[in-house]
Structures are given as C-alpha cells and as structure tokens.
C-alpha cells in the first residue's frame, strides 16, 4: 500500500514539474534517497532484531560496518542535495561560498567519519552513531556550498552517484540483493558520468569530491563591469543573415529551456533546411542544469540525432560556419575561459562560437550567466544581440524566413 501511495505521489510530482525545473526535481529526489538510507540505518541500529542483525549493543560486525557506511553516505547525499536544490532554485546564491581553511576542514571531517566508524564498530555506542550522522550531514553541506553555479551539472551527477552508494550500503544491511545491485549500478554510472564531465570541463575529479572548484577569484574585468558597446538587432536582421548563409550552427542553453523554445527552434530549423541551408546543433557537456539537459529538450522536439553534435565533434566547424545562433547558452560560449586565468571558468573547454562569421545571440538582457561573470562574446564585432524571449524571437525569425 505504501509503495503504491509513494509511487503515485512521485508520479504526480514528476508529471506536474515543467522540464525547466527538472534539475531541481532530480536534486530533491536524491535528497529523499539519502534520507531513506539514514532512516533505515537508524531503525536497524535501534532495533537490530527486526532486521535479524543481532540485539542492541551486540549487532553483527559486518552489518554494523555496512549500516555505518550507508548512513554516512545517505546523510551526505541528503544535505548535499538540499544545498544543490536551494542553489538551483535561486533560494541560495549560486556563487561559490568559501572560507579560509575549507579544504583542511573537509579533510578533517572525512577522516573523523572513518575514525568514528571504527570506534562505533568496536564499542557500538549510540552516542558515536549520532555523532557520525551529525558530522555526515555537516560534510554534505560543506562539500556543495563552495561549488559554483556553472558546475552544477557535475554536482547533480555526483549526488546521483552518492545516492546509489547509499542505497547499496543499506541493501547490504537489509540483505536485499535487488537494492545492492540497483544501488551499485546507479553509484558506478553516476561516478563514471561525473568523471567524463570533469574531463570535458578540464576539472579535477578529486576537486569535485572535496568541493570547491569553480571558486577562483573573479578577474577585475568581471568584477568591475564597464559599459561596452553592443550591436543589437531584431528578427528581420537575423532572418536576413540566415537566409544568406550556407551553414548555421545552433547553440542551445538554459535560456532555451526556460523559454520552452525547443519546438519553435525545430520549426525554424525545418524552414532553414527547406532553403538548402545546412544546420547542426552544438551541445556543450554542461549546458543547462543537469547532464544531458539539452539533449532531452531537443529529443522532446524530435530533433534528428544525426544533427546533434558534442563539443569535441563540432568545435572545429565554427570557423567555417556562416552563422551561429546562440539561444540562451551563456557561460559555455564565453571566450574568457580561454584567455583570463582569473576567471572562475578558466580552463573549461567552451564552444568556439566567436570564430563564426556572424553570431546571433538571443538573450533577454546583458546579465551574466550562472557563473556570475560577464560574457565577452556579447561585445565582439561579429555578434548581433537579439534582446527578447527566446521562444518569441525564434518564432518571429521563422515568420521572416
């Protein structure tokens, strides 16, 4: 009965949540997985007889180790996912929150978790069990707050991995083979995806685990924004450039997701293809707010898979393209990632959009992206800013083609 009730509630929430809020939903569900692991561990520790693990104060050693690991990882997953949810929802600042001695403190707490687990297994003290849970909740909080907004897709992937390992740990405690297998699958796939994404962003995998990447001090140019001239246009200008192009590369980002412009974009592309214009889609590995965010939206709009390319597959094509149509992709197109060592996104591979003959950038304003820094692409000679809602602008361009 409870499985049915929970399943219906989950299905209702997932059905009602718009695609733009999917990252927040994923983070929220991850927190529930972690909390469930904590509750199961507490129940097993307080009443081990109900789980055939022994008696209070005399729990089987192997079960106690599994229980402790599952509880610790579950607590880390819960508090970390809550912080990720708050950052994604805008309730908490998406900028990195750092303080002096943060990494040594994180390392000290992680070592403390190992030491306390050892003594907990030796003494089976309830006080140590509650201390273990408390500092695990704390380290989950501390691991996520220093991670910058531009890197949230990696955080979501990493928390997905944590939730899997938490489930697997509790699966061992309950001697539930299905829970062990599914938890291990989720944990390992999440870890592999995180590693692949980190390589694509030129980030260290261990920095993700310890927390704190994306926290570099901003450059002076980012902190002291000067009024620089930009060229702005309208749908007529954009349609004229596209009609006279032989190749167009579409660069979707979170702005497309917010405006739900993927279907309008597909219609525009279909019109371009009828005019014998070659069109491709360039997807950055961390575009959007979770892994594969743009791919999901384009698939929803029935965009053919053979037109969608990852960064390393299409980046060299920008230099030969006539028009790049950037629709809400901000940080992943920022050239300062290649030129400014003080930038928070320095070293992250970005799409070489500025190499196109003409760049059409659809955005509501010149406000910074999720990383909180100005985009130099706005001010390039070959960039034409289209200040409007992404969906409306795309529809207007289609009418003028």
Sequence positions of predicted segments:
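Cytoplasmic-side transmembrane-helix entry/capping segments in multi-pass membrane proteins
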Residues: 1, 21-33, 96-108, 153-162
